[in-house]
Regions:
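Substrate-binding pocket helix/loop in short-chain dehydrogenase/reductase
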Residues: 102-103, 107-115, 141, 208, ...
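The beta1-alpha1 cofactor-binding region of Rossmann-like NAD(H)/NADP(H)-dependent oxidoreductases
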Residues: 43, 65-77, 108, 225-226
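Residue(s) in the substrate-gating loop at a strand-loop-helix junction
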Residues: 146
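Active-site helix of classical SDR
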Residues: 126, 164, 172
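Short C-terminal tail/terminal secondary-structure segment
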Residues: 2-4, 231-232, 243-257
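Conserved glycine-rich cofactor-binding loop
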Residues: 18-20
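Alpha-helical segment proximal to the catalytic Tyr-Lys
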Residues: 131, 177-181, 240
């Protein structure tokens, strides 16, 4: 029986692939045989990641610079990827911005930044790469959401971030419905607290971390590697009958509250 999780011959684009969760997922997809295009602003980081992926997985990888909140830049990225690889089968939107400030003292510019990157960036990426997938009548889109899209925290400062992730959830569900006739699956990964730079504030506070883990059945913080299997699943033929779903990677957090 053919391995349903193999991605041989596929081309994946990972936005935000220059580090953190995006880099880990890009490497995971490449490990299953997919060619990978990593894209973000920092070309130096991207080139290092692409070289590392090629060295460790033997799959072809390329780096592309993009400003995800600029439509022309995203459209140019699509052209560059098509010129390099000929097609796009998988799109992963792993870009993200997270600023925590009290609601009564929340700078408008920080609010705008999160909505620009998390919401506008996701929609622009889906829109531009979606054109390619609609034409070929096949594709897999994986957005990066968060449990914060449906669940408040025990402490403040998450109003902006939570609102953007709720928006990502609805972009995901709406596109899943709109693009179903074109055989395009649109889903989202929604992790809880993951060991990344964005989670540093919580991880540095033992009391806050203890309160958080009290509500997590598996009693640990997630690792970037915990997202890889789910990403491969949603990118692979194994998930062909799954669309419009938000997959929670949270150690059981949303199951108990």
């Amino acid at each position: 029986m053919t391995d349903m999780f193999r991605l041989d011959g596929k081309v994946a684009v990972v936005i935000g692939g220059g580090g953190g969760i995006g880099e880990i997922m890009a490497k995971g997809l490449a490990g299953q045989g997919s060619k990978v295009a990593v894209a973000s602003r920092n070309m130096q980081k991207l080139e290092a990641v692409a070289q590392k992926i090629q060295s460790e997985t033997k799959s072809e990888a390329a780096a592309f610079q993009v400003d995800i909140i600029d439509k022309q830049s995203v459209a140019q990225l699509v052209k560059q990827v098509l010129s390099k690889f000929g097609t796009v089968d998988i799109l992963v939107n792993s870009q993200g911005a997270n600023v925590k400030k009290p609601a009564v003292d929340f700078p408008v510019e920080d609010w705008d930044l999160m909505f620009q990157v998390n919401v506008k960036g996701t929609m622009l990426s889906c829109s531009e790469f979606g054109k390619v997938m609609i034409e070929k009548k096949k594709g897999k889109v994986i957005n990066l959401s968060s449990v914060r899209g449906i669940r408040a925290t025990l402490w403040g400062g998450n109003e902006g971030y939570s609102a953007t992730k709720g928006a990502v959830d609805m972009i995901t569900r709406s596109l899943a419905s709109e693009w179903a006739p074109y055989n395009i699956n649109v889903n989202a990964l929604a992790p809880s607290l993951i060991y990344t730079e964005l989670a540093a504030v919580t991880l540095r506070d033992p009391e806050r971390l203890q309160k958080y883990l009290a509500n997590v059945p598996l009693k640990r913080v997630g690792q970037p590697q915990d997202l890889v299997g789910a990403c491969i699943f949603l990118a692979s033929p194994a998930s062909d009958f799954i669309t419009g779903q938000i997959l929670y990677l949270d150690g059981g957090l949303t199951a108990v509250g």
